[in-house]
């Protein structure tokens, strides 16, 4: 796939209405929707072949689910889309029949909402037969619905007057111009329904326990990405059963001298987002964060077996830059840093610039551009050199996200509700960081003001960033919060990839300057499509 290359002009602000994107939902999804419609019209029971009327009803509901899923993705990507959910183009069609305008965003979402609810009432909550894993379930319907309604309540599409002139061929506003607070309540109710139904069906956060029965936060967060549903990972609500293309993602996060393509990293901004071991952000003076200097001993912790099983015997090694020491467990599962342990070759990473035989940074695009490798979803036993990889399900929705979705929606529609902390704390407990409380007497907790909606919003957003990092959700979060222009524009930092020794390497250094234009909140309709259909209106600010 060349998707990684496609994104370069996008992040540099060079995207145009003639730019190509491999995903191309605009072309692909209508074809799939048409196939679903044809199937629904023609499927029938064949009892002698084991296709019972019940099975037929399941398959029809699965098609309804897929149609709603595709339409929700189209609306989230393009804003206004042509919408004819039940039409099948006849073979003797006139080209003019296909030229329809765009339907307002909220109308598409309302249709998807009804279809997902209807399908959820027909489909089972899960399948016990392994061969049926991956087929649509009621829980998948409710998961797609909950995230969709959360997005639909968010500032980008809920009364966004930036789009006052974004109208379809009938003169209707494509994005609503009036803020509707009830959308947050609808989203919260959808999230809670998902959680209630999922937990009743046996779904739960994935946990690995220590011998004393306590949660191992390192192993829990790591293995949640690798264990299959039938291995007890019932946190997975919706996944691609075929797994993933390991040779690409894993190779990009493996050094070139170890047979990888070593250019996939994370930003300094993400590194800074992880809290300290005590659960406080590094910006809090009470967090004990120390950025400069080096550790004088190996770091051990008694709440995990991860160090001995996966990381060569310690959390961090003596001589590690203090920036990376005493951080929360999720940090070590997600970020590979200089002097961090590389299990494939039983050594530590060397990110200093060099000729490539003794270093992981030879200065090419196959080297860390800012002193970091991505680590999340890279199994500690993966060996790119030998082509051996741990199975990794392609998780699209998981219960941990559902908890955070619910906390966010609840904070917007019912600030002060104690369930906001309940569900935030479920995530933090599994992550091994101190939980939040409205009391202020217990050092085992962090005091917060639950009634301060803005403070809680910041905490929820921060928790999403860390818990859901590298799962494909951050970009849509920044879009829907209308923060992308601020966050994705300007200098991006890391360590100094040109540094050949500690003194020159360990400096916050700009490795890239990015540009995010107001137009980029929506993907443009490709100019070829605009030229074909005079009824289409281009996404805002692209013309």
Question: Which role fits each region the language model picked out?
Answer:
Residues 1-2, 79-81, 85, 109, ...:
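An aromatic- and glycine-enriched ligand-binding surface/loop that stacks and positions planar moieties
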Residues 2-78, 94-133, 138, 302-304, ...:
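Conserved, well-structured interaction surfaces
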Residues 28-38, 107, 111-118, 140, ...:
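Extracytoplasmic/secreted proteins, especially bacterial periplasmic and envelope-associated proteins
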Residues 29-32, 111-113, 150, 188, ...:
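Long, intrinsically disordered, low-complexity segments
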Residues 75-87, 157-159, 415-427:
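Short, well-structured active-site flanking segments
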Residues 348-349, 378-381, 400-406, 416-445:
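Active/binding-pocket-proximal capping segment
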């Amino acid at each position: 796939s060349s998707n990684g290359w496609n994104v370069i002009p996008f992040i540099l602000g060079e995207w145009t209405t003639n730019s190509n994107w491999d995903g191309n939902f605009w072309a692909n999804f209508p074809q799939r929707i048409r196939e679903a419609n044809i199937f629904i019209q023609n499927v029938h029971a064949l009892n002698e072949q084991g296709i019972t009327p019940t099975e037929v009803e399941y398959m029809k509901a699965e098609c309804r689910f897929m149609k709603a899923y595709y339409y929700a993705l189209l609306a989230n990507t393009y804003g206004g889309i042509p919408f004819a959910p039940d039409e099948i183009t006849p073979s003797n069609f006139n080209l003019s029949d296909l030229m329809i305008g765009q339907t307002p965003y909220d109308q598409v979402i309302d249709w998807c909402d009804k279809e997902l609810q209807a399908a959820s009432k027909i489909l089972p909550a899960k399948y016990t037969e392994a061969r049926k894993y991956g087929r649509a379930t009621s829980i998948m319907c409710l998961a797609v619905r909950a995230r969709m309604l959360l997005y639909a309540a968010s500032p980008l599409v809920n009364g966004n007057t930036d789009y006052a002139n974004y109208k379809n061929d009938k003169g209707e506003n494509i994005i609503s111009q009036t803020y509707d607070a009830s959308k947050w309540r609808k989203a919260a109710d959808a999230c809670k329904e998902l959680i209630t139904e999922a937990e009743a069906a046996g779904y739960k956060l994935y946990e690995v326990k220590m011998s004393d029965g306590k949660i191992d936060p390192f192993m829990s967060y790591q293995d949640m990405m690798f264990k299959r549903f039938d291995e007890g990972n019932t946190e997975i609500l919706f996944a691609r059963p075929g797994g993933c293309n390991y040779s690409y993602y894993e190779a990009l996060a493996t050094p070139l001298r170890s047979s990888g393509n070593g250019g996939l990293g994370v930003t300094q901004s993400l590194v800074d987002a992880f809290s300290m071991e005590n659960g406080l952000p590094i910006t809090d003076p009470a967090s004990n964060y120390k950025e400069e200097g080096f550790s004088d001993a190996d770091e051990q912790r008694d709440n995990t077996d991860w160090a001995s099983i996966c990381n060569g015997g310690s959390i961090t090694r003596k001589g590690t830059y203090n920036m990376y020491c005493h951080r929360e467990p999720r940090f070590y599962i997600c970020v590979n840093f200089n002097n961090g342990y590389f299990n494939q070759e039983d050594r530590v990473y060397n990110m200093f610039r060099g000729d490539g035989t003794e270093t992981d940074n030879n200065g090419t695009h196959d080297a860390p551009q800012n002193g970091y490798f991505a680590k999340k979803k890279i199994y500690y036993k993966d060996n790119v050199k030998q082509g051996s990889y741990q199975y990794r399900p392609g998780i699209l929705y998981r219960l941990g996200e559902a908890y955070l979705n619910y906390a966010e929606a609840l904070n917007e529609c019912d600030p002060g509700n104690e369930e906001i902390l309940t569900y935030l704390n479920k995530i933090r407990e599994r992550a091994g960081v101190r939980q939040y409380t409205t009391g202020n007497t217990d050092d085992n907790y962090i005091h917060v003001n639950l009634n301060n909606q803005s403070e809680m919003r910041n905490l929820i957003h921060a928790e999403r960033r860390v818990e859901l990092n590298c799962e494909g959700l951050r970009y849509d979060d920044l879009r829907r919060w209308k923060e992308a222009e601020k966050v994705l524009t300007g200098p991006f930092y890391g360590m100094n990839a040109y540094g050949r020794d500690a003194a020159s390497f360990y400096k916050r250094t700009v490795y890239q300057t990015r540009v995010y234009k107001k137009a980029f909140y929506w993907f443009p309709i490709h100019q070829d499509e605009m030229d074909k259909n005079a009824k289409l209106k281009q996404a805002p600010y692209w013309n």
